Design a protein with these regions (language model features):
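Preference for the N-terminal adenyl/adenosyl cofactor-binding alpha/beta module
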Residues: 1-346, 357, 405-415, 450-453, ...
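Glycine- and acidic
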Residues: 1, 120-127, 142-156, 186, ...
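Long, amphipathic alpha-helical stalk/connector segments used for oligomerization, subunit docking
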Residues: 482-508
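Signature of N6-adenine DNA methyltransferases within the class I
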Residues: 1-87, 91, 155, 338, ...
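Basic, amphipathic alpha-helical recognition segments used for DNA target recognition
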Residues: 783-825, 832-849
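Non-catalytic DNA-recognition/assembly elements of restriction-modification systems
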Residues: 331, 529, 698-705, 709-753, ...
């Protein structure tokens, strides 16, 4: 019932947008008027059966012929023939037929609710709070319907755009270069080398050529004396000419230094690999557009086009070639697919424009040689020119992208309906009243419902399942039958896509039914084999149906056969569910997952990339930061070592601001290349940022090469500068952790710490005051450790209280909960007698400073001791100066440690310390 309700509401929302643009009988309130006329007529049949259902399946889905045109207009008025999957009979309608009905009062309430809103098809900024556009539909679904049930969160456009462009465009460039390496290199890398600042984002360029004030410039020399004192002014807010919102001079200078480094590498011609565009965070969208528009080599242009759009067969012996395939395996309401469409559309347009210009130049020059070279160009230009107006051509190009480039799967049926609806609305938004609406695409075979993690994904898995691991050739005939049917699937699937984008072409209900029937038979057969692997007695129909309903298997190898048979998808993007496996295990189980111990569905989705991504493809996912830091994901990190040839990670905190509103998730964005490479992995720092920084958050990302990992399971560092890399290497010189020798199970040398650090870590030799009706200790937050001696306690607690350890906790740790294991993992040398005496003195001074700078606060019914960390920071700095000598840090490295994230940690008083 929920599913069919979503189907009907999706159709009605689509029609509501149409009537707002006068596409329904030129009436902006077409549906309301038809409902009122029905109610006034006091008909015995419901509005749904008498008018709405016929409108769906006859008015919008029946092709106009001389015999039907007049009758359709007489019954429904002037309404467009839309075709497409939205108004084809849904599987629920085929299953239940006449039994489906909806009461009139449901439509009265729904239409009244719709009438309260302003409906817009464009992407204007929303002002009134009562406006609805296609983006809002996705937000509403993810925010209020899907989030709590499925661990899915609405992904904002800046995230989808960053991930999308850095996976889709590198995949395209890689495919074109593979076909024409010499021609590509001769065009691409000189363009980049001589581009100046064209591909450096404006945020990175802000103030880069402005002269620094003398007191700021005084801190640039890292070799001179008193570096920390000379750099003290760097904690002041930078001036507006030089800075981005909220920047202090320390951040502004780091950004400027990075920009100058990029400029130098560009000018020297050092950046000449597709991955460099990601590593140095260049404007990859503008680069590829300029690359295409500056190309005069028709062979290279055709390569761009056919790798983008696919190649329709021109002769009977030719095979259909698919375009760049972009998959979101957990697509939700389609946020990433929408972003992919917006990324691909300008590339289609640029390639068409450039082909048209190059062809015109050839004709003007009288070039009649090699007619076959131009034949396909002439045909594709004619196909899109036949659309007529610019808007109609935009419609044709957008439709082509939706049909030939975008694919999605989701376990939530309603999500896939919303995703398809948003793509349909994107098409209609291109038109104006009076335009003819070309038939909508049918993308029921592009956007699919099912469980990404349950089902056969490869030929080997499918063959093994059908033949049986121990049954010899008993099922060989069955496997051969499947292979024969898959050949038919490929032909039907390809024809289904081809027919939709050829001018005047359309897909009949019979075409769709034939493909659906073939797929259904294959799915039924594979479900039978898979259920047996799960121990289900398939002879008991009820048990079999319950298993199918709970597991919702999706057989990638069959359902996307033409793509999977060719090796997989070119670009995989998405935001997989962050759900602990234990919470869904009673509903469904996953099998064949090597990372099962990781215990979270997002981990299994990452492992699934190994079969979904073709060789030399790219993927981009946003996942919890735990992937790179906790022991539970050791096996996943090991798998990633084999999965990715190159990897680009960026990391984001939840304080002061978070990427997902209302969701407490520290996040990592993974951009990965699935092919052989030099194995270079790159990482950013752990970003703690303010909301004012969001507009430039992704355009000013700075990545550095990740230091060599100690093992495949080692934590992934979260660092963003060479200074941090040097500090990390100095720490790693010491294999042993002193805490392993200095801690014991019980003693009088107790230290206390808060398990969830905010902007600093306090390790104390006294229990902070806490009083509430529940007790005299904050049992949920305060943890304790015991040391072997006073000196041992001072060393462990002093190190734990330092800014050096605070940085290390975020660079290597889980960024959330501080544990004994985190302390045991910190490498350091043992102190000699003089060092032990000094650390005891420094620790006593720090404890005195904490006590002197504390007060008792009351919140609700609890009273607690609050510490002024800013006032105590000089004592913390003294601790860091001590450990800087221990680890042989340079003044530049010590300056970084003492001032690590200083703006976030101390706020507006940063300039005073």
């Amino acid at each position: 019932q929920r599913w069919y309700t979503a189907v009907v509401i999706d159709r009605l929302m689509f029609l509501w947008f149409l009537q707002e643009k006068n596409f329904l009988d030129n009436q902006p309130k077409y549906l309301q008027q038809r409902l009122q006329a029905h109610l006034d007529g006091k008909h015995t049949q419901s509005f749904y059966k008498r008018f709405l259902s016929p409108l769906f399946f006859k008015g919008f889905a029946q092709e106009r012929t001389p015999e039907t045109r007049a009758a359709i207009q007489a019954e429904f008025g002037q309404v467009p023939y839309l075709n497409g999957g939205l108004f084809a009979q849904h599987e629920l309608e085929e299953r239940y037929g006449e039994a489906l009905d909806i009461a009139d009062n449901a439509f009265q309430k729904l239409f009244a609710f719709f009438d309260e809103w302003e409906w817009h098809l464009d992407e204007r900024a929303l002002k009134s709070g009562k406006e609805i556009n296609p983006d809002v539909l996705g937000y509403i679904f993810e925010k209020f319907v899907n989030q709590k049930q499925m661990g899915a969160y609405y992904t904002k456009e800046d995230i989808t755009e960053y991930i999308g462009k850095n996976t889709i465009i590198p995949a395209l460039l890689g495919k074109v270069r593979a076909e024409h390496p010499a021609a590509f290199d001769a065009l691409a890398w000189p363009l980049l080398q001589h581009s100046g600042d064209a591909y450096i984002y404006p945020a990175m360029l802000k103030g880069v050529d402005v002269t620094y004030p003398p007191e700021i410039a005084n801190g640039l020399d890292t070799e001179g004396p008193d570096l920390l004192a000379r750099r003290k002014p760097w904690n002041k807010r930078a001036d507006e000419r030089s800075s981005l919102p909220t920047e202090i001079w320390r951040e502004t200078i780091a950004r400027h230094q990075r920009t100058r480094e990029v400029r130098a590498k560009l000018a020297a011609g050092e950046l000449k690999d597709v991955g460099d565009l990601i590593t140095w965070n260049l404007n990859i969208r503008q680069f590829v557009q300029d690359l295409i528009e500056g190309c005069t080599d028709v062979t290279l242009l055709k390569s761009f086009w056919f790798n983008l759009a696919g190649r329709l067969p021109r002769h009977s012996h030719e095979k259909f070639r698919h375009g760049l395939s972009v998959l979101d395996p957990t697509c939700g309401s389609g946020a990433f697919l929408f972003a992919a469409l917006n990324i691909l559309k300008p590339l289609y347009d640029a390639t068409l424009r450039t082909l048209q210009a190059v062809r015109a130049d050839a004709l003007m020059a009288g070039d009649t040689s090699h007619p076959e070279k131009w034949a396909e160009v002439d045909e594709l230009l004619a196909r899109f020119a036949a659309a007529g107006s610019d808007r109609a051509q935009d419609y044709a190009v957008t439709k082509h992208i939706i049909v030939h480039n975008l694919y999605g799967v989701d376990i939530e049926k309603q999500a896939t309906e919303i995703a398809k609806l948003r793509l349909f609305l994107k098409l209609v938004a291109l038109l104006e009243p009076g335009d003819t609406i070309a038939p909508l695409p049918d993308i029921d075979f592009n956007i699919r419902h099912g469980n990404t993690l349950v089902g056969y994904a490869t030929a080997d898995e499918t063959e093994k399942a059908v033949k049986g691991a121990t049954q010899g050739n008993l099922f060989s005939d069955a496997w051969e039958d499947i292979r024969i049917r898959l050949v038919a699937v490929e032909q039907q699937y390809n024809n289904f896509q081809i027919q939709q984008v050829q001018h005047g072409g359309h897909v009949s209900a019979a075409d769709k039914q034939a493909l659906s029937a073939t797929l259904s038979e294959l799915e039924k057969m594979l479900n039978y084999h898979l259920a047996r692997e799960y121990g289900v007695n398939t002879t008991k129909a009820k048990d079999f149906d319950v298993w199918k309903s709970s597991h919702q298997p999706f057989h990638w190898y069959v359902d996307f056969y033409p793509l999977m048979a060719a090796g997989g998808f070119d670009a995989v993007v998405g935001n997989p569910p962050y759900v602990e496996y234990s919470k869904v295990r009673d509903l469904y189980q996953v099998k064949g997952i090597e990372t099962l111990d990781s215990g979270n569905l997002y981990c299994y989705c990452i492992e699934r990339l190994s079969v979904l991504c073709r060789d030399f493809s790219y993927s981009g996912l946003i996942v919890p930061i735990a992937i790179g830091s906790v022991s539970d994901t050791n096996k996943l990190r090991e798998a990633c070592s084999d999965l990715y040839g190159s990897l680009w990670n960026s990391h984001f905190a939840i304080r002061p601001t978070k990427l997902f509103d209302g969701v407490e998730q520290r996040l990592t964005i993974l951009i990965g290349y699935h092919g052989s490479s030099d194995g270079a992995w790159h990482t950013s720092k752990y970003h703690q940022w303010f909301s004012d920084e969001r507009p430039d958050l992704f355009s000013r990302l700075m990545l550095v090469s990740m230091p060599p990992r100690l093992s495949k399971q080692s934590p992934w560092p979260k660092i963003g500068s060479l200074v941090e890399a040097r500090i990390l290497e100095k720490l790693r010189r010491f294999e042993a952790s002193p805490a392993q020798l200095l801690l014991t199970d019980a003693s009088k040398w107790v230290m206390y710490f808060h398990r969830t650090p905010g902007y600093w870590i306090r390790m104390l030799d006294f229990l902070p005051f806490f009083e509430s009706p529940a007790g005299d200790r904050s049992v949920h937050h305060i943890r304790e450790l015991c040391a072997t001696s006073e000196a041992a306690r001072s060393e462990v607690a002093g190190l734990g209280s330092s800014s050096l350890y605070f940085w290390w906790f975020f660079a290597i740790g889980n960024c959330r909960n501080l544990t004994k294991g985190d302390l045991l993992g910190f490498p350091a040398p043992r102190l000699d007698a003089d060092g032990s005496a000094e650390i005891v003195r420094l620790f006593h001074a720090l404890m005195k400073s904490y006590k002197d700078n504390s007060s008792v606060k009351t919140r609700a019914k609890a009273s607690y001791q609050e510490f002024d960390w800013v006032a105590a920071k000089p004592a913390v700095d003294a601790m860091d100066e001590f450990f800087a000598n221990v680890f042989e840090l340079t003044d530049e490295e010590l300056d970084f440690v003492i001032n690590y994230d200083i703006k976030i940690r101390v706020g507006d008083v940063a300039e005073e310390i």
